């Protein structure tokens, strides 16, 4: 990956933030690894490999990107996503779309870092997974120790026949701030999903997590679970629900 010269200094700062969130910067720069680096409303760099198409645009302060993965793509190395915001205050909006083909085996590692100030981060994500595919998504966050972070994210995933979707969200290395997460999954026949969230709330953090699994296809199965530590005067509201909409299903 080549970083734009105009963004070289900002990339140095985002490197530090990325490492705070648990990332390895070398993975962002390797040419044989799919990666995307977003800082505020700017795309600092991106890289892709054969079989994966990454389209990115910014418009009116919003970062929009679409990742299309062709049928049969199986990656030995994870796709790395780096999201950060380095200003003392402001808003960050991201719209993400993923289209994953049939017979794929894909792992995503996402690290998000907001080390400064009063930030509103809003993200809408849609993922469509084809048939007979395995998709793992690990999303780790690092926020600052003040109370200025408002994280508002909405995820929708459709899991095709015989496919597996495994999603892990983690925010345990810092305060959470105000957190609102909505995860919705639709499962087709013989598909499986695991949704797991781990969050550590401190002081007056405000946590809202909703994980909804719709078992639409026969013999589909799903797990939605959250691990929350609420210290001090933290408020936490967690909703995990599964709906059986097929004649034959399994809820674990």
Residue spans for each PLM region:
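Conserved beta-strand/loop scaffold segments within soluble protein domains that form the structured core
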Residues: 36-37, 44-252
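Short, Gly/Pro- and small/polar-rich lid/capping loops
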Residues: 1-55
């Amino acid at each position: 990956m080549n970083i734009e010269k105009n963004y070289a200094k900002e990339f140095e700062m985002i490197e530090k933030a990325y490492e705070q969130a648990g990332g390895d910067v070398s993975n962002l720069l390797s040419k044989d690894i799919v990666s995307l680096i977003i800082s505020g409303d700017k795309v600092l760099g991106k890289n892709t490999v054969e079989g994966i198409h990454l389209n990115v645009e910014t418009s009116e302060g919003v970062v929009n990107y679409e990742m299309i993965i062709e049928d049969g793509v199986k990656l030995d190395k994870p796709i790395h996503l780096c999201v950060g915001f380095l200003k003392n205050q402001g808003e960050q909006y991201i719209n993400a779309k993923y289209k994953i083909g049939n017979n794929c085996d894909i792992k995503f590692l996402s690290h998000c870092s907001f080390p400064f100030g009063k930030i509103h981060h809003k993200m809408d994500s849609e993922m469509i997974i084809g048939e007979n595919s395995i998709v793992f998504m690990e999303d780790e966050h690092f926020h600052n120790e003040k109370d200025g972070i408002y994280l508002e994210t909405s995820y929708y995933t459709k899991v095709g026949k015989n496919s597996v979707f495994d999603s892990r969200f983690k925010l345990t290395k810092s305060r959470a701030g105000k957190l609102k997460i909505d995860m919705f999954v639709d499962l087709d026949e013989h598909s499986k999903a695991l949704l797991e969230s781990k969050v550590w709330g401190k002081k007056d953090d405000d946590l809202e997590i909703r994980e909804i699994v719709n078992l639409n296809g026969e013999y589909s199965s799903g797990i939605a679970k959250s691990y929350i530590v609420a210290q001090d005067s933290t408020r936490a509201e967690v909703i995990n629900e599964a709906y059986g909409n097929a004649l034959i299903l399994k809820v674990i």
